[in-house]
């Protein structure tokens, strides 16, 4: 597999073409952003942790019957994935009130929902990723009804897998963001990453935040939190 030119750079990753038109290489960066890009910084070692954690969790999704773009981990920071066209819908699955949900609806953080809830946002930096519903997505031709139904099905299935896994690690899955893509034959697959960048993860006993909120809220201990959540994952899988 030959690595070719860079074809994309986002806030947290670079993407490179390969000599196979169906495959690309994702390179995870240590760069961090928050507050709609207004807050920028670096989290030492984040790229390594997010790459390796994502790959392990994507493997668990595949074993649970959820198709993903994951192919093979190449190095500490690089992974070979299927080339996809990203569906411009960010999916947010919430189990507990936190973050924008809490501030938007004027509720305290930490309220456990009777059942998980799902939100969509339009993946568009210029518009600051506005929330939208399924009818908006259809009107804007962002996806079809069939694709939206499948994305919802996969998102709730991901939630089931992640909640059970993190519970065994002594971690509560508060909420998380997902992205999906379409392969060249139109198959919907889970893409992007599953990491402390995209998930809210609290220690089950102390409710200590072990995710990017430590960066967003200037809480300190960001690198330690990322390292701790990775350690719990590795310790779990080693047993």
Please state what every model-predicted region is.
Residues 28-29, 95, 189-196:
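Short beta-strand elements
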Residues 111, 116-128, 159-170, 195-200:
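Phosphate-binding core of ATP-grasp and ATP-grasp-like enzymes
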Residues 38-48, 131-154:
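Short histidine-centered catalytic/ligand-binding loop motif
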Residues 194-239:
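C-terminal helix-cap and adjacent tail motif
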Residues 2-121, 233, 237:
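Active-site loop/lid in soluble adenylation, ligation, and acyl-transfer enzymes
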Residues 93, 173-192:
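Conserved metal-phosphate-binding beta-hairpin within the catalytic cores
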Residues 72-77, 166-182:
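A short glycine-rich, hydrophobically flanked beta-strand micro-motif that places a catalytic Asp/Glu
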Residues 142-174:
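A long amphipathic alpha-helix within ATP-dependent nucleotide-binding catalytic cores
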């Amino acid at each position: 597999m030959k690595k070719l030119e860079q074809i994309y750079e986002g806030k947290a990753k670079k993407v490179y073409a390969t000599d196979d038109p169906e495959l690309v290489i994702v390179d995870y960066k240590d760069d961090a952003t928050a507050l709609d890009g207004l807050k920028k910084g670096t989290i030492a070692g984040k790229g390594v942790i997010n790459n390796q954690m994502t790959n392990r969790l994507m493997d668990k999704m595949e074993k649970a019957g959820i198709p993903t773009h994951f192919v093979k981990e190449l190095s500490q920071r690089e992974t070979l994935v299927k080339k996809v066209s990203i569906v411009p819908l960010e999916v947010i699955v919430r189990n507990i009130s936190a973050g924008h949900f809490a501030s938007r609806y004027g509720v305290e953080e930490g309220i456990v929902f009777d059942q998980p809830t799902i939100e969509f946002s339009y993946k568009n930096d210029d518009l600051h990723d506005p929330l939208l519903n399924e009818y908006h997505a259809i009107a804007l031709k962002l996806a079809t009804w069939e694709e939206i139904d499948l994305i919802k099905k996969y998102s709730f299935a991901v939630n089931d897998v992640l909640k059970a896994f993190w519970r065994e690690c002594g971690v509560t899955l508060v909420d998380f963001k997902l992205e999906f893509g379409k392969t060249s034959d139109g198959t919907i697959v889970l893409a992007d990453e599953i990491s402390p960048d995209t998930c809210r993860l609290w220690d089950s006993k102390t409710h200590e935040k072990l995710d990017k909120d430590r960066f967003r809220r200037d809480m300190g201990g960001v690198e330690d939190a990322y390292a701790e959540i990775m350690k719990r994952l590795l310790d779990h899988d080693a047993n």
